[in-house]
Design a protein with these regions (language model features):
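Predominantly soluble domains enriched in secretory-pathway, periplasmic, or organellar proteins
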Residues: 4, 11-385
Length: 385
């Protein structure tokens, strides 16, 4: 009888542990292999690969699980089923995409291009291009770099902001009319738009400028520039801002300089930089832990994750993640906050970090030069950017 009780207890413990481990997958585009790896993060192995176009970069998933892959080496999007892990189709585009973004209601996909000043809007029900809008004057000579970067949707889905990096402007496009509602002149090319927590301002994170690099604050109602905040850099440090994030209370905005190693901290009330920190080389993406206490900063020219204590505004640790010095754009904290996933793109590994210990616990081989990944958590597709 005693053996039976023990056996029953072991069975119950096994069953509980099985229930406590929901399905968790990473969907990883490989720019070097022209495919997508489907990774079971619980088993820590690749289940299958899916073919894509050339140089697949990012993925945008609808809530139902339809995924759009932007291929940066061919004029097409690859559409996948994120539940069955199958390729559905390809969507032919008028140019080569740089980035994509879904509308808040998931009904429309905005496509910004690297080799054309155009913005396409795609109906996600039919996968047909509804309209393609010219957003600026095309360059007369060969243009170095991507002409556009990340598109940004307003909360109500009525407008899309698109960066015109040829003419250093942001274009506001009305979705219903397909017309340009506003043109905002910037001191340099824009990389990303972050809405303030109260929605009143847009923080335009700019790249290289004559004066260095800056964050331009834009009134989200009038589309007028409120202030251009210059970022203090070390002597000789190139300016090339990339991404940022707000603290949970909205009092500070941390922004990363990919051109060097500076992470600048802006007081959002004063609209001024109050402190700078030194991260790894190519500081790119700050990801906040679930409890709001730390930023884990991904670098694009280094082999460490920089951990910043938000309250103290200090770097508390550098976590080595391999030998390669190129990391993918994005990371993911598990819902319980215990683990953080990122990719070392030169080592071709997905890295799992224990958040409390701030140490690497495992590495999962993935495809070559993966620069982005998406997550399937149960039936959900949470953001990794």
């Amino acid at each position: 009888m005693k053996k039976q009780v023990i056996a029953l207890m072991l069975f119950v413990l096994y069953a509980v542990s099985a229930v406590a481990a929901p399905d968790r997958f990473a969907i990883v585009p490989s720019e070097g292999d022209n495919n997508i790896s489907i990774v079971d993060l619980n088993a820590e192995k690749v289940l299958k690969t899916l073919p894509t176009g050339k140089t697949p970069h990012a993925i945008a998933f609808t809530r139902e699980g339809k995924g759009y892959v932007n291929n940066r080496g061919s004029k097409e999007l690859t559409v996948i089923d994120g539940n069955k892990f199958e390729v559905l189709k390809s969507i032919v585009l008028p140019a080569t995409s740089f980035q994509i973004a879904l509308s808040p209601d998931n009904k429309t996909l905005a496509v910004a291009y690297k080799d054309a000043l155009k913005l396409s809007l795609i109906d996600t029900a039919t996968d047909a291009i509804k309209i393609t809008i010219a957003v600026g004057k095309e360059p007369e000579a060969a243009f170095k770099g991507a002409m556009m970067k990340h598109p940004y949707w307003t909360k109500d889905g009525a407008y899309v902001y698109a960066s015109d990096n040829v003419n250093n402007t942001i274009i506001k496009v009305g979705v219903k009319t397909g017309s340009i509602a506003a043109t905002i002149n910037l001191p340099g090319p824009n990389h990303y738009l972050h809405p303030s927590p109260d929605g009143k301002l847009l923080y335009a994170v700019n790249e290289a400028e004559k004066a260095g690099t800056s964050v331009t604050l834009i009134d989200s109602v009038t589309d007028r520039i409120v202030k251009d905040v210059q970022i203090p850099l070390e002597a000789g440090e190139p300016g090339l801002l990339h991404h940022g994030d707000f603290t949970k209370d909205g009092k500070y905005f941390f922004v990363c300089n990919e051109g060097g190693r500076t992470v600048a901290i802006m007081d959002t009330a004063k609209q001024d930089i109050v402190k700078t920190l030194k991260a790894g080389m190519g500081a790119g993406h700050p990801g906040m832990t679930r409890d709001g206490n730390y930023f884990f900063v991904i670098q694009h020219k280094d082999n460490v994750i920089t951990v910043i204590d938000i309250a103290k505004q200090e770097v508390v640790k550098s976590i080595p993640v391999g030998t390669g010095k190129k990391q993918a754009h994005g990371g993911y904290f598990t819902p319980d906050g215990k683990f953080y996933y990122m990719i070392n793109a030169e080592d071709n590994n997905m890295v799992k970090i224990d958040v409390s210990k701030m140490d690497v616990v495992s590495k999962i081989p993935v495809g070559k030069s993966a620069m982005f990944f998406s997550i399937k958590e149960g039936n959900d597709f949470p953001s990794t950017e």
